[in-house]
Amino acid sequence: EEQGPVRVTFCLRGTHVSHANDRRVLPFVIRETIYLNSTKIDFEHTFLFDGDEKKDFLKGLGVRFHRPMKGEMYNRHIRFGTDHGSFHEEMVELLSWRPRVAPEIYDTQTKGQMLYLDADNDQAAATAIEASKHMPIWSRYVLCQDSATHFSIKKKIVNPDCCYIEGLHGMRAPGSVNIADESGSF
């Protein structure tokens, strides 16, 4: 849509599709702006209400991201911006008492740093790798700003028989997210 020496803006247009009846409603425009020498990406989602105000009501509106991940499960991280900093988790958290994972490995992981574990030459690394095989894999996260003064973050494992569990509540989330793995972050 716009291209210059300092920024570029991409414009995507489409229509939401109702899951209930495949009805096409709410035309939308998404603009992504990328800036020179900046890690910031602006994301603007605009929708046009084209329904019948007497029978069509909005329960919620959201944006869903799917990101293919690479590398070890314990090196996959997600971070949401919150009103008091950030909510950060690993897809596989190496907090285990049996087998006991070395505290320095867990501390490195919780700082969002990549772990380079060599099971052949390091017993602590071998223990962490073995423990990771028995940990839940938190692969689905939801950030929901459900009112002007409340948001929640929930997480879930892949198993369809399992429900989401609460991760965090707060007042306002800026809507920022960082998803990282061994190949980089988004």
Predicted regions and their residues:
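Beta-strand/loop-rich accessory regions of lumenal/periplasmic or secreted enzymes
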Residues: 1-186
